């Protein structure tokens, strides 16, 4: 990630690392937002898929989930550099599997035997919120999941800023 000439110039620029990171994240999130609007509009207006009565929670879950995953990708790229794409892909498949997206029973196995994993897996929080908003009237767990996703975004973002401050190039 930061081995390229562009990354080296960016890292030694007199711009704060926080501004650089916020710019990167904003651009990627803007692209995600456009994609989300197109997909959601297609599912809702063209295919007429019912999303339940809590559209605002579904939309907020999708947006916060997207932000957390963008931040996770950013942090993994900072840590692993050359192997980041492979690790992100593998991590996404594992997180999705553990959230029950390939095998419904897995979600319940994880919740019974590794409950902490169910609360730190973004895919599990997102799928759980979609399930909760469609089937239940009590949204307290959905709000908890949104809070956890928000906290994850802040913590991962803080880590990224901290990690970027340590990057320097003595010999260019």
Predicted regions located by residue number:
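Juxtamembrane helix-boundary/capping and inter-helix hinge elements in multi-pass membrane proteins
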Residues: 12-18, 139
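Hydrophobic alpha-helical transmembrane segments
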Residues: 43-45, 76-77
